[in-house]
Amino acid sequence: MKKKLLALLLALAMVMAFAACGPTGGEESPAPGTQTPAASEPAGEEPGGEAAGSVYYLNFKPEQDGQWQELAEIYTAETGVPVKVVTAASGTYETMLTSEMAKDEAPTMFQVNGPVGLNSWKDYCYDLSGSALYGELTSEDYALKNGEEVAGIAYVIESYGIIVNTTLLAEAGYSVEDIQSFEDLKTVAEDITARKGELGFSAFTSAGMDSSSDWRFKTHLANLPIYFEYQDKGINSTDAIEGTYLDQYRAVWDLYINNATCDPAELTAKTANDALNDFVTGQAVFYQNGSWEYANVVGEGKLSDEDVTMIPLYFGVGDEANQGLCTGSENYWCVNKNASEENIQATLDFMYWCVTDETALQAMTGGEGAMPSGGAGMAFAIPFQAAPESSNPFVALDAEMTAAGKTPISWNFTTMPSEEWKNMVGSALAVYAADQTDANWDAVVSAFVDNWATEYQLANG
């Protein structure tokens, strides 16, 4: 009996000795916002194979919903960590984020559009300065900071301008070399309109003013008068815009709506899909949109790479011959610091996987056939060290123009004071399109200038 007891005690001592050499499992996790770099390294699964935590990503970009759903399924299959992706409809992200953040199961991963968006959500943002994701950035310039904290990380760099069907343009007797300024664009567009019956196509796609499409004009086109005013003043934000270049804004808007596939009075009923269909079915030569739209315009049953290119959004200001595309980001990933520690770590792990895993990187940067399912990838240019070159030719065009000495137009619409400001400008543009009087344009100017000061005060006190 004594021998058995002695053997049992020796065995127990050996087990305890081995246990002392391994992980204790009793270390406390740092509180949200105070992690060290080591604390945010990808954690993987817990011993025993049970996944820790879950991810809820509220996605901003409806055009990439399918790809994110597929990536979420792949990640869950590989790790066991549940990943839910919910995508807001175009123009509804802020409203949906506000609603979802009030719920018990709030998003663990969300995004803001830049400094103005961060101002609304900074109290929810986990400090990413010690995260593995932050360590993967190619430049600190892609980090969105709140004081010393890294509140958001840009996950895609994009460009927009005017997408051109070069085949149709050639049928009209022109090439992109003939368009080096706003006046050149106006001459070509108005000539196409004059010969529309003969040619069988229009100059521009419909400039839809429903919520799926109006952001192209109340935000992206509106960036141009803001950019040039900021350039004049040497500033990068303001509490009161003057509207110095709103005459040029009107000239471009007039060109779009009076040389398009539909009557200007119909624009409030026209959607993003209407404009896309105008373009891919050969009904229009010009389509204001961005690099994110590549997979929607090129591919099987659509146009070919040889059919399309992108030119700058000429505005009739400055050295237009040396103007580049409008390039920047309004897509910053943030992590909800009010989520549980397990869910925060699960979210950090998922984000890191997205920018380092071969399958995820191919999905984010690849084009036709890049998804494991065989579908088109997101064709993004992403600012992370492991990223391959994007297969998106619009991204390559931006790089080529910059290398040739052309100046990209920066994204200053991230300083627009509120979503309400954008909506008021959009509504005024739609009213003007239906009845193009000076009085109605004055209402656009008022929405742009007067409401900027009002909305800025409401947002900043």
Regions found by a protein language model. Name each.
Residues C21, E100, P107-T108, S129-L169, ...:
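A structural signal for short loop-to-beta-strand junctions that line the ligand-binding cleft
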Residues A170, A194, M401-G461:
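Conserved C-terminal helix/tail region of periplasmic/extracytoplasmic solute-binding proteins
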